[in-house]
């Protein structure tokens, strides 16, 4: 039996690789001689660096950068190919998980550290970038990142604006006269599944501001500042389009990548599946295993298991999914190519206990074992 396993991380519980190895253990209890291939999986958010670094045979490096509130943080990123492609998660430098709830305030949080990571990768010879921009703590329109890469963002007195969204309030000049020269050689693929524009009722301030600590007054102010920022950018960069789908991703970081770096915004899942060449493994499989922490109606909306299932169905392969929990609307997954799905939680336990790594790994192994025991039973009755 040839089995391909590609399971997304169970956030806060198991990494993609841990989930895959646990599933493999369960299969081998029933089919000890099975040919099992474990491929790392992510959707462009958490786990993207690990998935691409492991899946493409790259290396991981670390750099100390400016965190969202100015304190130093250690950010890991991957280097692929012959050292020319860097894989970065912006959340490693400016993520909301780096802050406590009381620290969250988008007026002050900055993307400066994201620019520092890019700068470090450029210094190491990287010229191609894959960047996941989910999980941000910021709403600064990417101006912090731009400053770290040499852009001059000045107030009316010619002084560099401060970090955070407050810098947008005072912004009067945007100049690329002193930008890092190597940027002209760089390409950027941005893993982004958010389609929000920069401003307005569906813009980043209104939709994502509250979870980053913004109150209604701050939301209104930041939206106005971002609108003025876009108008200012258009004077020097005619292709500026704040209404572009995804411009509002990561507090306007998507806008900065589109406007100043001519980046492409792409489905995070598609980037992962393409770069790790998952189809090359699935085409020879007898069965495909996927999953994620929670399987629900949103799974079919561009999440990793649906991407795996789509490839599997191109080769007419059966797909089984395993998850921590399954909601009522998860039935939509059947139409997306997932033939059957199974929750791995066994017995009445607290959420905290169910998410403990050792507990989750054991549950994955035991559940997969029982499913494959059933498969063997039906095979033996033929």
State each model region's role.
Residues 1-133, 137-382:
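N-terminal loops that bind phosphate or other acidic moieties
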């Amino acid at each position: 039996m040839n089995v391909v396993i590609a399971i997304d991380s169970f956030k806060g519980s198991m990494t993609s690789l841990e989930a895959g190895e646990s599933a493999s253990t369960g299969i081998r209890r029933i089919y000890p001689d099975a040919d099992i291939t474990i491929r790392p999986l992510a959707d462009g958010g958490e786990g993207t660096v690990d998935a691409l670094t492991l899946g493409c045979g790259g290396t991981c490096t670390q750099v100390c950068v400016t965190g969202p509130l100015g304190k130093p943080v250690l950010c890991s990123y991957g280097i692929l190919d012959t050292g020319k492609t860097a894989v970065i998660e912006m959340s490693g430098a400016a993520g909301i998980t780096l802050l406590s709830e009381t620290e969250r305030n988008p007026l002050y949080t900055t993307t400066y550290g994201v620019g520092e990571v890019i700068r470090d990768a450029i210094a190491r010879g990287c010229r191609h970038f894959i960047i996941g921009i989910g999980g941000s703590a910021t709403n600064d329109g990417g101006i912090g990142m731009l400053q770290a890469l040499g852009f001059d963002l000045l107030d009316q007195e010619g002084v560099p604006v401060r970090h955070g969204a407050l810098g947008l309030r005072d912004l009067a000049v945007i100049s690329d006269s002193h930008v890092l020269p190597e940027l002209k050689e760089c390409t950027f693929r941005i893993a982004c599944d958010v389609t929000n524009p920069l401003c307005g009722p569906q813009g980043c301030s209104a939709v994502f501001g509250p979870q980053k600590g913004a109150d209604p007054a701050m939301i209104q102010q930041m939206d106005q500042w971002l609108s003025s920022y876009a108008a200012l950018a258009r004077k020097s960069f005619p292709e500026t389009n704040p209404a572009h789908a995804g411009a509002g991703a990561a507090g306007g970081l998507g806008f900065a990548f589109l406007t100043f770096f001519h980046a492409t915004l792409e489905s995070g899942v598609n980037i992962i599946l393409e770069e790790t060449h998952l189809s090359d493994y699935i085409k020879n499989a007898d069965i495909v295993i996927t999953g994620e922490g929670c399987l629900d109606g949103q799974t079919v909306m561009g999440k990793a298991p649906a991407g795996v299932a789509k490839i599997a169905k191109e080769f007419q392969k059966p797909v089984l999914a395993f998850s921590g929990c399954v909601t009522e609307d998860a039935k939509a997954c059947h139409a997306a190519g997932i033939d059957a799905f199974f929750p791995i939680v066994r017995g009445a336990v607290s959420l905290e206990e169910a998410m403990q790594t050792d507990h989750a790994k054991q549950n994955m192994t035991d559940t997969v074992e029982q499913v494959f025991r059933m498969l063997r039973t039906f095979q033996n009755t033929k």
